[in-house]
Structures are given as structure tokens and as C-alpha cells.
């Protein structure tokens, strides 16, 4: 049965009303043809079947009509490990495009092979489905009999619900009352009207984060592509058109292919789903905060990175989305493809954006599949994309950062503060308890109260929500990467620069002790300061460590670990035959050096590297090892080969 892109369109329509005739026919066919052995399973064999989520069980038991659900396969690619293996096999590091291409081919190959038996069965029985490769799963529309049959396939790990949910971030949105058109927005509390800006007034969020000072250095996001996964975008908005990657200013025409994708197909808000549109205004607002320039309308620059380009994907329908629709946009961002194309064969990973903004939430309490979306975000991160996520609008209670994707370690989660730097009451707090991790979230806070930006019909308005804080950060990263291109694709170190340069705020909310500390579950590491981040990135350091034994003989293959005592970031390397180990890129802070392992561990604490300081040198000894270190400013060119020595952060 046809799966691209018709199923997406049929699914969208059926979610809002009755089943289309073609799906009714498919359902009847599925019931009338004989099922394979996988479906002929007796009740006593239940233990041998793949797991099924309680939410999906309830949906299937509620009636005989087909529902949308996810078939998650057992064979899943560890994207990070796959790329490490590819670099090892190549005997050299891969650049960003090569890494993205290698990952795309690995994911699609594995998914095609393992999905083949299921897809053949689904085709034979006329069952509508949509396969994915970014996580190895298939979205299926079927009834209880279809679900039971699929549970019997050896390739299947579990079945999960794919509920149609109203985004928690758009639901919590607050707007000012002076919007000029009659366009109906998502429901939200009305806020006090914001006064209209003049050409001399920048939005406070840009000023507070010191973006203009970065522009003065010549860095405006040039060469960087940011992405919006949201309710859509008015691409030809006066403030956004020039920064749209699909707009050719010389030819005065647009090419939307590879620059826009509408998951909802024929339920697009335009007659042609290949043309960007926005059915709520939320997405247009967030893109404006990333790249908008309203000077042509007699206003000011409204975006953090007016020199960056943007692309978009509509993952929500009237503010409603599903785990599958969210995953589909991530898949487009990993390797963009045409609206009518096949993501498995038509993807172009070389056109993938650098940074992906996500101002939406997917509640597990309503059936959102935590594990699948976690793997999706981890894969995007492994590809070198920064996944920025709004923390949520469920504050001020503790442990309210509880929804995908902001709850994940692989996402960079952002809370909201006002023009005075005070945390917004609605901003969700950590720690993350939904998965039992106790993970510190959010990482940072950014402006998110009465944020002035673009909205549909060439208008402007002020919104409040962590949805507004997240694009401030996504735009800030575009500035950072345009200033320090050696960080492009290195998500770990990019996050380190952002959190280490943030303005710390002492707070005791959601902590076991009443003593205010930083970082904390309210503000994270503090308030976003992109000028300080760029300053830090432009003054990198390097460390060289020499390890000898008690008789001064160089020691080979000895573990050397440098730990940032503020963030817990861990650099791991080992000595060569000359006893030397090098950590090529780090930033000022306080570190702990650890030599060896287990009972033979030599620890040197309190190594302080300060901005503008002279090289830091020291030694340490114990009964087995002698270690001498030197940490100094880097003034040479950052070579891509250094990535071989850059470890990943140890994340809780």
C-alpha cells in the first residue's frame, strides 16, 4: 500500500474526523484476508509477544475502529557508536557532512533490512503505515487484530501509542492583546498589551543577552542554518523572508524543496503542502526570535542571529501533534527531502540544519512514547545538531520539566526569565523525575516574558512562555558558531561554553537544602549571555600532561581525565609512548586531574584556569605515578583532527 506521502495526509484527516474511504477499504481488507502465523497466536502464548503500552491497549479495547500506533523494532542503531566506528575504519575524523552522510546511510540501511518482513506483511494486507529510520519504527493504522499480529513478529520489540495531543508549550502560551488581525490563535491567557517598538528599540531579550555586542564583533549568525519544528512559518513575512534559505534574493523567487516540510500533508494550511504556512502563529513568532529583521517595517531587528538562515517543518496541526509527527520532522532535519519524496532514498544530509529549535512538549501521561523520542534526539545530537528545547510552562512546582523532549539529557533545555532577569512563574523547574534520573534541568534560562516578534499576516506581537526562551538560545548558538566555527557540530563543547559563560543566579528552589546555590533546578546554570559565551569561545585553552613512573620513565597508555568541577564535563584521553597526553580544547574554569584508574588513581584537585591568566603549571605524585601538567592559551588554528581526542561529557 502507498506510504509516502499519502499516509500522512490520510492520517491527518482521519484524526480530525471519520476514516476516509481508502482507509476503510484497507481496514476491511485486513479483516477479510487470512492472517499469517504471527496473527494465529493463542492466548496462552501472550508471554512470547512483543510488549504493548497500556495507553495503546486502552485505545484498542475502546472500539473496533483502527487507531494509529507505533511498532518499535528491536534492532536500533546506536548513532554515536556507529559514527565512532566509521571514523576508526577511515583512520581519520569525518567532517560534518561526511558524518551526516555516513549516519544517514547506516540508519536507512539497517531500518530497511529489519523492517522488510513487517512491511511486506503490511503491504499484503492493505494496512496503512509510515516507516521511520531515525528511530527504527513503523507508524501503523490498524485495529486490535493488526496489533496482535504485529506483536508476534520476532523483529518487534514493543508497540506504543501514537496519541494526538495538544502541545503543552503552545497550550501554555500567553499573548498580548494588541494583535491586529482576526486570525484565531491557540488558546492562552491574555496578557497586558505591549507598546509598539520604534526603530531605535531592540527587543529586551536581544539586549539582555548582549547579542548586539556580538554583532559589533562582526558575527551575526552567517553561515549557520537554524531550524523550526513548530506550527509552521509564514515564510514571506517581511521580517523573515530575507533569512529563509529557500529565498533567492537575486532571482527574487523561492525554492521550498529541502527547506520546508509539512508532516500533515494535504491538511496543510495552504493549497500546496510544499509551501510553508502557519496555522497558529506560534512558529512564525519563534523563527522571528531566531533570525527576524523588522527594519523594513520601520521597527528593529527582532532576531538574535539576523545573519543566519532558517528552514522549517510543520510538526503540529492546529497546535496538535503526535510522537510520529514530531519524529517525522526530526527525520526531515537529519536529511531534508522533498514533500513528495521518500525519506529513505531522497534525503540530502548535506542540507541538514545546524541547530533545531523545539518549542513544544509531548506528555507521557497522555501516551507519549518516551524511549522513541529520546532515541530520536540522541541521533540528532550524534549528527552534530544542537537540539534546543523549551523547558515547559508548568511552573512554579518542582520537577515539572517532565515531558519529552526537554527532559532528555541530549536536549539543551531552556527556562524563561523576564526583563529583570527574574524567573517566570510559569517556567518549569527541575530536577527530572519522570525517568528517575534526577537530572538537572533546565540548563539555562533566557528571555521568555512579553517577547516581541513576528506573527502571521506581516504583524508583530508579544508572547510569553518558555517557547519564547528557547529560540533566543537557538539564535545565540548561531552567533556562537559563526564566531567560533571550530565548535560547529561539537555539541558537548558548545553546551559547555554556554553554561560556563552564563550569569549564575543563586537559588534554593527544588533543592533538599535551603542554601541558595548555582547551578540549581530553577535557573539551571544561570542567564544566557551570548557575548560572554563568544568571548570564552574565542579564548580557548589546551592542556598537556606528562606521566612518568617513580623512576621518571614515560608511561604509555595511562588514562588521563580532566574534570570540570562546575559542570562535571569530563575530558578523557591517554598517554602516548612518550608519556604525553593532550587535551586540545577547553575553557577557563576549575578542574580536577586524574591519572590512572581504580586503586592506582592519582588525583590533583583545584587546578584553576582564569580568563587572561598566564599558563597554569603544576605537578602531582604518589607511590606509582608522577604527573606534570601545563594548561595554556591556544593561539594556533583549530584542526579538525583534534576531534579524535575530544571526549563526550559524562551526563547523568
Q: Where does each model-flagged region fall?
A:
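Substrate-binding/access-modulating region of protease and related hydrolase catalytic domains
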Residues: 215, 220-222, 293-297, 312-410, ...
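Protease zymogen maturation seam
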Residues: 42-43, 102, 153-225, 238-241, ...
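Inhibitory N-terminal propeptides of secreted protease zymogens
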Residues: 41-183
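Subtilisin-like serine protease catalytic core
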Residues: 42-43, 60-66, 82-83, 158, ...
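Short, acidic Ser/Thr/Gly-rich low-complexity loop/linker segments typical of extracellular
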Residues: 564-585
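Hydrolase catalytic cores
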Residues: 287-290, 311-319, 400, 448-518
